[in-house]
UniProtKB/Swiss-Prot annotation:
Its main location: membrane. This is Voltage-dependent anion channel-forming protein RSc3414. It is found in: Cell membrane. Disulfide bonds: none annotated. It comes from Ralstonia nicotianae (strain ATCC BAA-1114 / GMI1000) (Ralstonia solanacearum).
């Protein structure tokens, strides 16, 4: 996730890190070369050519802009829904920690509360690895008791295994008489909300935008940008490469941004900063029981949070 202070309008023009321009440079160079070919064909090799009007390109460009707008909106909806789900995860984790501290009839043993908070703090890390399909071993082994760690690693769905343990913790406190029925109901409501968060994230990961829709827009963008110089060369001559590259940047950048944020749990610069948010959630619940901060592990690296 790109996190930068508000930039002056001129510095914004020169921003490089976090922009999609670096990955587009080879493609824009290709459009530049095609523009030179169009100029050479028009001026030197085929002085008598069929003049292409810019009208068809204008109509196609308008339609393509509308399609790209729909694509970007669909991608941003997925991105924003993912961010709201992780915000809800933070709220639920804080609520459950507060309940563990305030709802029991008598104050629970510090070790019991600390174990509960440790497992709750490990949940976002387990979810992050589940969504990114990475190995959670290092993160979970440092946060979970050995028996629970082995149990979680043996499960296919590690966040669900941690949720099961949290439910068992509530059941055990209820059997001991520390929690009454209303307190158990309050815990269960937040556990249900956490389950909805996990399920919502898994839904986003397992349901991409329709491939046929994405490939249709992708092909149209690149065919349009490759053909555009041949439609402009008659009217603007030597300025064809400049305008062709600029128009290509506008269309290709929109498509590249949509492709990045379509999968919000990835590791590209404009994806959600799940590492940072996992540490933030863990730090938030630790703070409620007086545990020290995790430190500045989540500091931005060249304005990029991962």
């Amino acid at each position: 996730m790109v996190v930068r202070p508000h930039l002056h309008w001129f510095r914004m023009l020169l921003a490089w890190r976090g922009s999609v321009l670096p990955q587009l440079l080879p493609r824009l160079f290709l459009i530049f070369c095609i523009s030179l070919v169009a100029m050479a064909v028009h001026v030197h090799w085929l002085p008598i050519t069929v003049n292409l009007s810019t009208t068809p390109f204008s109509l196609i460009g308008i339609a393509l802009a509308v399609f790209l707008g729909f694509r970007n909106n669909a991608s941003y909806d997925r991105y924003w829904e993912a961010r709201k789900l992780w915000g809800q995860l933070l709220n639920d984790a804080r609520s459950m920690t507060r309940q563990a501290l305030t709802l029991p009839r008598e104050t629970l043993a510090a070790a019991d509360v600390r174990e509960f908070v440790q497992v709750l703090g490990a949940l976002p890390h387990a979810l992050r690895h589940q969504l990114r399909r990475t190995d959670p071993r290092d993160d979970l082994s440092a946060r979970l008791p050995a028996p629970l760690f082995e149990r979680v690693m043996a499960s296919r769905y590690r966040p669900a295994a941690l949720m099961l343990w949290l439910g068992e913790w509530v059941r055990q406190r209820s059997r001991e008489g520390s929690l009454d029925a209303w307190a158990v109901l309050a815990f269960d409501r937040n556990l249900g909300s956490l389950s909805n968060v996990i399920g919502g994230c898994e839904r986003i990961v397992s349901t991409p935008l329709p491939f046929a829709y994405s490939v249709m827009i992708h092909r149209t963008v690149y065919f349009f940008c490759a053909a555009l110089p041949f439609g402009l060369v008659e009217s603007i001559g030597n300025f064809t490469p400049v305008f062709s590259v600029f128009v290509a940047y506008a269309f290709m950048a929109h498509e590249a941004i949509a492709a990045q944020i379509e999968e919000p749990f990835g590791t590209e610069d404009n994806d959600l900063a799940l590492n940072t948010m996992s540490l933030m959630i863990e730090d938030a619940v630790r703070d409620l029981i007086g545990e020290p901060s995790l430190g500045d592990e989540a500091a931005a690296r060249a304005f990029i949070l991962d």
